[in-house]
């Protein structure tokens, strides 16, 4: 059975984008590069998260409460600024089929060491602390992925 998913931009604030469905990584990364190509940044480090086929899932599905995610992201924008860098991200809302992308991020920096360090820190913190709720899609049913989710400190979720 083949499921067709459509993707369209739902929400954008400076340097953070939310889309319905899987991400068009080539379009996003190309647009980001075009935006900053002439800004004298010596490093552009992208990261792509791809949905793996495991445990019988056909897709993952995501819920996001935008104000909480925006607050989390704004802290990273400030951390990046302090190091002379820019951090960007895009994430999916809703269903994202296996072998497609639900998350991309990138760092632009004058120095590669800063960019490499910052992208690693950002992606690791995203995985551990970004307020995004993940569900497995198995046989067309959405099942909360509690075993692969991280409790949010002070939120009373998953705790």
Feature annotation, model-predicted:
Residues 2-9:
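Intrinsic disorder/low-complexity segments
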Residues 10-101, 108-110, 114-120, 124-159:
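N-terminal, polar/charged subdomain of small-to-medium soluble alpha/beta proteins
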């Amino acid at each position: 059975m083949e499921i067709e998913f459509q993707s369209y931009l739902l929400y954008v604030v400076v340097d953070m984008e939310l889309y319905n469905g899987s991400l068009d990584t080539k379009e996003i990364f190309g647009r980001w590069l075009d935006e900053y190509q002439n800004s004298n940044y010596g490093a552009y480090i992208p990261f792509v998260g791809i949905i793996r086929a495991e445990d019988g899932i056909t897709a993952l599905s995501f819920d996001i409460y935008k104000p909480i995610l925006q607050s989390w992201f704004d802290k990273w924008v400030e951390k990046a600024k302090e190091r002379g860098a820019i951090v960007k991200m895009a994430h999916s809302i809703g269903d994202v089929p296996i072998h497609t992308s639900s998350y991309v991020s990138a760092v632009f920096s004058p120095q590669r060491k800063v960019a490499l360090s910052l992208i690693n820190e950002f992606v690791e913190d995203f995985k551990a602390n970004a307020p995004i709720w993940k569900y497995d899609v198995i046989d067309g049913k959405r099942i909360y992925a509690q075993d692969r989710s991280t409790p949010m400190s002070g939120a009373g979720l998953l705790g």
